[in-house]
Amino acid sequence: MRIAVISDTHDRFPPLLPDRLKGADEIWHLGDVCDPMTLEAFAHLGPPLFVVRGNCDVHPGWPESRALEREGVNFLLTHVPTSRVPPGFAAVLHGHTHVPRDEEINGVRWLNPAASHGRAARARRLRG
């Protein structure tokens, strides 16, 4: 399974993003979408879209965090990195800082794809 992880789009849908997301089975947006209408562009790409609410988001229907299990691996999606991780999660995916992150702390992998626009633009493939 290929999962495209993005964050901090801040009302933007970068023109190169569709090519970077091509082939993804799912798209996980880690918050700061800002205008919910921006998600329509992501929804038209086809794969299921999962989103969490960021500090710049006001949409009441988006959760602050989301637990997902894929291929036996438990992921915690959130915007602002949490100080405590509930037991059972192999990875915490977050945005907010606009700084790429890929590190392991106490057996938990911490990932941040960074902002999805400007020089920090990136979409990363995550494998379980």
Over which residues does each language-model region extend?
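Helix-adjacent hinge/juxtasegments
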Residues: 48-87
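N-terminal active-site segment of His-dependent metallophosphoesterases
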Residues: 1-49, 57-64, 123-125
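Active-site neighborhood of phospho(di)ester-bond hydrolases with catalytic His/Asp-centered motifs
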Residues: 5-7, 26-32, 50-55, 76-79, ...
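Binuclear metal-dependent hydrolase catalytic cores centered on His/Asp/Glu-rich metal-binding motifs
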Residues: 12-15, 36-37, 71-73, 78-89, ...
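Non-DNA-binding regulatory cores of transcription-related proteins
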Residues: 86-105
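Short acidic/polar capping segments at secondary-structure boundaries
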Residues: 11, 97-99, 115-118
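Residue-level detector of beta-strand structural context in well-folded domains
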Residues: 64-66, 100-101, 127-128
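Binuclear metal-dependent phosphoesterase catalytic core
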Residues: 2, 71, 104-106, 111-128
